[in-house]
């Protein structure tokens, strides 16, 4: 009997926690554009630098491949 009540209590607690989380997400949506951290560059800059680096490496390796095969 105590085990059943404990199980029901756990199920109710989990259900309430899930509903509370969903309610807070709907009521207070996260800001899609958070204020930038002044100590780090914005993510776009870091991603662009990374992609540009890969692009340069890729182009130079293709150039070396064509140059060596000719």
UniProtKB/Swiss-Prot annotation:
Keywords: Late protein, Membrane, Transmembrane, Transmembrane helix, Virion. It comes from the Viruses. It is a single-pass membrane protein. The chain crosses the membrane at residues 2-22. This is Virion membrane protein OPG139. It comes from Monkeypox virus. Belongs to the orthopoxvirus OPG139 family. Phosphorylated by a OPG054-independent mechanism. Residues 27-49 are annotated as: Disordered. Essential for the encapsidation of DNA into immature virions (IV) and the subsequent maturation of IV into mature virions (MV). Residues 23-68 are virion surface. Residues 31-44 have a biased composition (Pro residues).
């Amino acid at each position: 009997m105590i085990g059943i009540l404990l199980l029901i209590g756990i199920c109710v607690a989990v259900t309430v926690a899930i509903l509370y989380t969903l309610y807070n997400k709907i009521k207070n949506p996260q800001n899609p554009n958070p204020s930038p951290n002044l100590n780090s560059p914005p993510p776009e800059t870091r991603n662009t630098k990374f992609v540009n680096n890969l692009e340069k490496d890729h182009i130079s390796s293709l150039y070396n491949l064509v140059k060596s095969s000719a």
